[in-house]
């Protein structure tokens, strides 16, 4: 065809190639729960944080115990008076082993950039070694599960709470989470773990599937993102329809980057580019190099 024609608020553009670097986790998933929109207090998704809300001294409800929740719950426990955590399905969690680099290490990296490159390579290799435990290797999965169980046992002494936080599915079936401080936060006396889904909302009362009722002042939805239906896909029209229509039966591409029927379109962090065992930054860098080589 004649290339790509783009319509923007500042006018129309034409280009021979189009690179979509729109990100993947951009559209929050909001559950369809009776009464949710009528919640009596501040209500927001973790990706649309309302910084005007005062959390100090508040009773905070959090819906979800996935990747978003393990990042925000520890801080909410530090700030709020009480946190009620509604968990539909627990996740396997392994140590993140996060730490700050020392001043000496920073000086060494500054003096020898190759040392930083070697460290990055080592971290990549460590991530790749984790793939077997997520891809059906029974021995690797069993070893990883034992590590996750040991992590849980070391940080959660209460047997009943441990049981509630233990998944009933095989390691690797769902996204494995990394956290050093989520379990300690959940063991706090300022946290109530409700091991059932949110069924409905009545004013400021959260009604769980178990029938339990919890009063909260603020409600945070840590309910994830719509990652399989990208909003930009509805705006991109190729030879035979929109990208959303092309992907209606499932997102497919070559090398996670180029899509049949959409000439000179490149999608960064495209289908199957996101990883559960290593850094997506590495994937995006490889895609960017592929785009540059293709257009050179």
Predicted regions and their residues:
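Short, surface-exposed acidic
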Residues: 154-167
């Amino acid at each position: 065809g004649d290339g790509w024609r783009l319509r923007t608020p500042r006018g129309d553009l034409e280009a021979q190639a189009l690179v979509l670097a729109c990100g993947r986790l951009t559209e929050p998933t909001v559950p369809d729960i009776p009464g949710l929109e009528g919640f009596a207090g501040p209500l927001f998704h973790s990706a649309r944080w309302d910084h005007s809300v005062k959390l100090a001294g508040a009773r905070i409800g959090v819906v979800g115990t996935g990747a978003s929740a393990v990042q925000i719950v520890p801080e909410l426990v530090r700030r709020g008076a009480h946190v009620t955590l509604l968990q539909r399905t627990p996740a396997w969690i392994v140590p993140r082993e996060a730490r700050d680099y020392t001043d000496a290490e920073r000086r060494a990296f500054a003096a020898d950039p190759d040392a930083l490159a070697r460290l990055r390579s080592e971290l990549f290799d460590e991530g790749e070694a984790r793939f077997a435990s997520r891809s059906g290797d029974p021995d690797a999965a069993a070893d990883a599960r034992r590590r996750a169980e040991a992590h849980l046992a070391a940080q959660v002494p209460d047997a009943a709470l441990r049981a509630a936080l233990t998944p009933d599915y095989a390691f690797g079936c769902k996204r494995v989470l990394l956290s050093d401080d989520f379990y300690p936060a959940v063991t706090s006396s300022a946290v109530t773990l409700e091991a059932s889904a949110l069924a409905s909302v009545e004013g400021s009362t959260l009604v769980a599937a178990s029938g339990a009722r919890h009063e909260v002042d603020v409600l945070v939805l840590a309910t994830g993102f719509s990652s399989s239906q990208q909003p930009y896909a509805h705006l991109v029209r190729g030879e035979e329809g929109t990208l959303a229509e092309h992907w209606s039966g499932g997102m497919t591409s070559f090398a996670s980057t180029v899509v049949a029927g959409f000439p000179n379109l490149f999608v960064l962090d495209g289908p199957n580019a996101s990883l559960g065992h290593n850094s997506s930054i590495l994937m995006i860098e490889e895609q960017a190099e592929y785009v540059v080589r293709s257009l050179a």
